[in-house]
């Protein structure tokens, strides 16, 4: 038996065939005056939740400050954003199977 460690996940279909998927968690920010969101990715759900809470707390404080984030998937990717320009933040799970199905931006669909 193969032991899977995050960020890998095994899923079985209706025929009992097991597939392994690479899972990452995306924290996406919508910025003022920008049609495209920016995002960073985390390998662990808890790490993504931590980044989400950090951004959310910065928004609640209301004081403009510089927020710096790094991406675990793309080595060397760093971004800095002024919190007063952040309009919204969302977190979602992305697997290799659904990699291209989520278009950038916020969705009101469940």
UniProtKB/Swiss-Prot annotation:
InterPro entries: UPF0367 (IPR020885). It comes from the Bacteria. Belongs to the UPF0367 family. This is UPF0367 protein sync_2587.
